Amino acid sequence: MKRTASIGTLAAMLLAASLAQAADPLDAITAAARSDQSFSGFSAERGAALWGRKGKDWSCSTCHTADPRKPGRHTVTGKTIQPMAPVSNPKRFTDAAKVDKWFKRNCRDVFNRECTAREKGDVITWLRSVTPSSVIP
């Protein structure tokens, strides 16, 4: 009986963990953005503009390139960065913890502050809208 309960508990925990990972990271960002009464949705256009906007020293495109379908290179470490656009890298934006971690780190590096929920949602919306035939200015 104990063994059956343990297996059932383990199965429930694994299901909960897989559902948590399957949740779209944009869902949590959307919930946070909705706390602002002026929020009316995310904008790919604003996301593209933020991607190219220079912060204190860099822009997102400094390391990630202007074309998010291509791999980038970290300016300081020289490490290769996989493409940001899901069309080139389907694993992008599939893990909410990673999305949160990297937005915190990169927004601080680029803008010397954390990005707002709207800014994060705008960037993800733009990156998800990029197709193989998209024209990137």
Which ranges hold each PLM region?
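Bacterial N-terminal signal peptides that target proteins for export
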Residues: 1-8
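N-terminal signal peptide c-region/cleavage motif recognized by signal peptidases
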Residues: 15-19
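Cleavable N-terminal signal peptides
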Residues: 9-10, 20
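Mature soluble domains of exported/periplasmic/lumenal proteins and thiol-rich metal-chelating peptides
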Residues: 26, 30, 69-75, 134-137
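Stable alpha-helical elements in mature extracytoplasmic
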Residues: 43-46, 59, 95, 99, ...
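Electrostatic cytochrome c docking/interface patches
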Residues: 23-55, 111
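C-terminal capping alpha-helices of c-type cytochrome domains
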Residues: 100-137
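Gly/Gly-Pro-rich "capping" loops immediately C-terminal to redox-active cysteine motifs
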Residues: 40-42, 52-55, 61-99
